[in-house]
Amino acid sequence: QTLKETLFHEKLENGLEVYLLPKVGFEKTYGLFSTNFGSIDTTFVPLGQKEMIKVEDGIAHFLEHKMFDMKDGDAADKFAKLGASSNAFTSSSRTAYLFSTTTNENACVELLLNFVQSLDITDESVEKEKGIICQEIKMYDDDPDWRVYFGAIANLYHKHPVRIDIAGTCDTVNNTYKDMLELCYHTFYHPHNMMLFVVGNIQPEELVDVIKKNQNKKHFLPETSIQRKKIEEPESVAVKEQIDIMQVEMNKLIVSIKVNDIMTNPQEKIKRELSFNLLFDLYFSKSSVLYNEWLSKGYINETFSANFTQERDYAFILIGGDQDDYHLLQKTIFDFIEHIDDLVIEQEDFERIKRKTIGNFINSYNSPESIANSFSRYYFEGICSFELVDYVSKITIADLNEVKKYFNKEYASTYIVKKDK
């Protein structure tokens, strides 16, 4: 209601959740088809089986690469012929396929459904893909920004698969085979584990008919709830400090903090995430006193950032940036962690940051990409992204002070990418 949007929702007989958001006056239409399956889903009970199995790391990303293969060509080429662009991405907890178009909207939705709901792979095509993915992994390995970011996360975890790169390693990629990909596909690409979201220049009643007709032609096994292995992760961090030597112009450092309190209540979870976001905005936005003080003293530069991430069953804080004197940056961050309770939050500053955040959320609803990506990101967490404005408006200073307890040196680790002298 706050956003004055009308969202159409229908759950189809096969279990697929469909959400359609018509935007009057929008030229662009954006479709996103997501599955609740990401890089951390490597130990599970396959559909129709009883025993838990472990598949290779990086398999969700490998499958994403192969989904565009169709019996009669490549899905991306078919979207291009319809005047649309297409893409896909894999995160730790989901895989999403998407298109963007200003024409042939219904045909694009059908193509999206068709290519994601059929897997056309051969042993040869799987083998061929291995080299391509390995090249991608090596490219990321050579990127110092990726190395410090991912290394900071990996340092925190002993057992949780989030410590492993989304694409896996060249070894795990080379040990991935056709039957394993098919097993994951049939388990996680079942309609009941997926969600279709289309936003833009659409006629919802007409489009929902197109979607229903498309789905009625297809046969799926009866749905069963997916059993994933619960990870028993120790509270301690795996590695306290790590230094990598690379060819960089300036040293890079990230302090990561493991958050062991894994929330299951969606409302509590989103409240915590938004409280962290407001807190970091308060301390580290370009207009904040603390940020500008650190900047003027040379503790940090424009690369500095701080953020909080939480997914299905893990959460962490990352604070860092580029700094020649990385010892100084590390000390600055650890002093901040130690004395965060002494930093008083003024009501006036808090209200200003809240208004800014609400304004940003409302502005994001002018972009079909932002709407779809935000909806998909929160959907599998049990949150409707259209309610984010209401959640932010209810947050208090007490909520921000509450998340300060997670800034704990005991659960902190440092990852440094140091220049080769």
Residue ranges and their predicted role:
Residues Q1-D74, Y185, Y189-E293, A412-K421:
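His/Glu-rich zincin catalytic helix
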Residues M70, D74-I226, P266-K271, F280, ...:
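Charge-rich, well-structured scaffold segments of protease-associated domains
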